[in-house]
Amino acid sequence: LKKDLHEEVIKGRLPGGSYSIRSAWPGIQLYYPPIKYLPAEERYETEPEARARLGKYARSSEAHTIIFDLEDGCRQKAGSRSFLSSVLPEVRQHIPGNVAIRINPMGTPENKLDLKLIAEIYPYIDDVMLAKAGEQEGLRDLSELANFLTGLSRNLRIQPIIEHPLALRKAADIFALPAVEHVVFGIHDFSRAMHVQITPGGWQQELYPFMCSLSLEARL
């Protein structure tokens, strides 16, 4: 997979240049639960167990970005925030790629706690992934997040997650934001919103028209 992605970057370069139309493809982005559920034992990890797992897997990962998820995939939100606050400053130097935090939608109670965490650990992260971007408040939620992040560091980037047709309609405006280099296509929530039944082996074809629309906006 990594080899194929690198080949795609090379194909995307303009003739005679060492750059692409936009910035380089972000590569492999791996979702990583800060606190993991252990189904065999019907419990969640303790902090020492989560710390040991992070040391074993995330440090040796070849992913270009490790995404610490605080949204839908995270059932222990408070514990995960506490864990990242105490552990990430210590282990960040050992993670070879970028670090991203996937946060809850702007304006929600969980989001306010997510932003408080980011204010503590921003020197150790590269990207903030915003769930449900552009759905309810249009670009206001992204502008609000961008202003918050700029107040911390101008190097922090936003990766909006496109999970609804309303957000797809605003894709051109989303890509025009200075803090946005890439977006993430949230296929599961998007397909549910469109009442499209996707399958594990055919989702690319089933969502092909929407992926083409998003790819076009990404290239303009």
What kind of feature is each model-predicted range?
Residues L1-L220:
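Expand to "…catalyze enediolate/carbanion chemistry for C-C bond making/breaking, isomerization
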